[in-house]
A protein has these predicted regions:
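Basic, Lys/Arg-enriched alpha-helical interface segments
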Residues: 1-72, 81-85, 92-123
Length: 123
């Protein structure tokens, strides 16, 4: 008997899709590589690749963590009601105030996720 493993869908928020195109190719490539783990393991994926973002309005807000192009990258994402991981916003936290970095990342992620959830309810 064989069991097929369910893959988790990973999608980009429309604003993040535009930002992704502006990232250095090395960062894009590494993010795409990290997305494979999200697809494979879904919400079971934990540290060091994924951690919960504390301070978000959403208890399921996470950060995908990786290094690329001499940077320390974080990509905020959450699982939506359709059980998809939606990537919301990214940032390089190398060389900046950690408190300020996370405040801005979480603010954008929460705003985008809120807008996204509202658009799902309108469909």
């Amino acid at each position: 008997m064989s069991y097929s493993k369910i893959k988790w869908a990973v999608i980009f928020h429309e604003k993040f899709s535009l930002e992704f195109d502006e990232l250095a190719l090395e960062v894009q490539d590494e993010l795409l590589s990290q997305m494979v783990f999200l697809e494979e393991f879904g919400p079971q994926l934990g540290r060091p690749r994924v951690d919960t973002l504390k301070g978000s309005s959403y208890s399921n807000m996470k950060e995908l963590r990786f290094q690329a192009a001499n940077g320390v990258w974080r990509v905020a994402f959450a699982y939506d009601p359709k059980r998809q991981a939606i990537l919301l916003v990214s940032g390089n936290k190398a060389g900046v105030s950690e408190k300020r970095f996370y405040r801005e990342l979480i603010r954008k992620a929460d705003d985008r996720f809120s807008d996204y959830l509202q658009s799902l309810n309108e469909d």
